[in-house]
Each structure stands twice: as C-alpha cells, then as structure tokens.
C-alpha cells in the first residue's frame, strides 16, 4: 500500500476539504480517466483495491497511472479507551480528494474496456466519480 517514506511530523490536524481541485484535474498521461465528483478522504487501502480491480480487468494490457497519493496520517484511539491522554496512534494513510481531481488514468486499451475497468475501480472508492475521455483534436 502507498504511504510516505518519511514525514516531517508524525501526526496531523484533521482539517477540512474546501473548494474544488486547483490542479490535477486534466488528463495528463492516459487517454481515459476517473475524476472525483465530491470531496472526501480516500485511504490507501481503497486506492490499492481500485488499482487491483482496474489492472485485473485490463488483464495487464495498457498502462495505469495513479494520480493521488495518501499523504495524510489518520489517527485513532483503541476501542473502549477513555477520552484524553493524548492523540491516538496513526491507523492508516489517506488522501484528501477535492471535486474535479483526476484519480486514475489508463491508456493502451479500447474505450469499452477502459469504461468497465474504471467502473470496477470506482466501486472501491469512497467518492463519487465520473469517466472522462481525451477529446480527439
């Protein structure tokens, strides 16, 4: 699963996801893409599950680009532990995804295969997404 090799600080504030994506909203690498429609935190497990679903359906033909990286540590306290006594330990890593963010891109396959592969990948993610395609000029 994806996670940073090293970070400046172990824990982070929760924060809020406001506004729309300022960058990373266009197709940069592939012919087809999966674009987020709503703000949410997507964890590393979801990203990995989506990647596996996409590559499995494509039967390893073509190429997949993951355009999001889980760089936010999410902490949790153990169950049945009283409040206080400091912040919990890091449970998993997540990525704050804004609306309009390109999450996955694929190339080297037909539109039908790309559409179905990204539909299967989207089912693993906790955000609403849509299929996008490069416009031929």
Swiss-Prot record:
Keywords of the record: Ribonucleoprotein, Ribosomal protein, RNA-binding, rRNA-binding, tRNA-binding
Record family assignment: Belongs to the universal ribosomal protein uL16 family.
Biological role: Binds 23S rRNA and is also seen to make contacts with the A and possibly P site tRNAs.
Subunit structure: Part of the 50S ribosomal subunit.
Lineage: Bacteria, Pseudomonadati, Pseudomonadota, Alphaproteobacteria, Hyphomicrobiales
GO molecular function, one term: rRNA binding
Gene3D superfamilies: Ribosomal protein L10e/L16 (3.90.1170.10)
NCBIfam families, A to Z: rplP_bact
Entry protein name: Large ribosomal subunit protein uL16
UniProt entry tagged with the keyword Transmembrane helix: no
HAMAP family: Ribosomal_uL16 (MF_01342)
Entry GO CC: cytosolic large ribosomal subunit
GO term, biological process aspect, one: translation
Pfam families the record matches: Ribosomal_L16
PANTHER family: 50S/60S RIBOSOMAL PROTEIN L16, LARGE RIBOSOMAL SUBUNIT PROTEIN UL16M
Record-linked InterPro entries: Ribosomal_uL16, Ribosomal_uL16_bact-type, Ribosomal_uL16_CS, Ribosomal_uL16_dom, Ribosomal_uL16_sf
